[in-house]
Amino acid sequence: MSIKKNLYIISFFIIFNFANAEENLKSVGKFKDWESFILSQDGNKTCFAQSIPVVRAPKKLKREPSRLFVSFRPAENIKNEVSVTNGYEFKLKAPVTAKSGKKSYDLFSKGKFAWVVDSKDDTKLIVTMKKASRLMIIGNTDKGDQTTDHYSMMGFTKAYNTAKKNCS
């Protein structure tokens, strides 16, 4: 099979799966700077609250969109999972940090995503997010550029509660 034909087949499956995922993705509420969703796939559902940053620095660095999530996946017994994508491949073994005021949480990265190091800290970070007006995510690209994304917490509690309720 030719390379061109292989690329065509791969592209078809990627597009089909993306379109299929969009059909199964439903917004269940917009709350100021946050939104809650339900994703249904293969009889399982994932509920999550998500937001995009209100400030991304440095401005001139080219990268894909950033997103901050709190997810619930009942089939996998996952609750309160905080994750983030900064729109780039994170630098291997470089720290990723979530900060609000004097509170700071360590995250580990794999590829384009990062998660809280200790799952017990997910709940602590969520409590911080409920009380905060802003959360900063500081990370490093695989090329060594440091980024800081600022997320508004306006609407977080309602979006979080909606996501949690829909997957309980």
Question: Language-model segments: what does each one mean?
Answer:
Residues 1-5:
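Positively charged n-region of N-terminal signal peptides that target proteins for export
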Residues 6-16:
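Sec-dependent N-terminal signal peptides
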Residues 21-168:
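A generic "folded-domain core" signal
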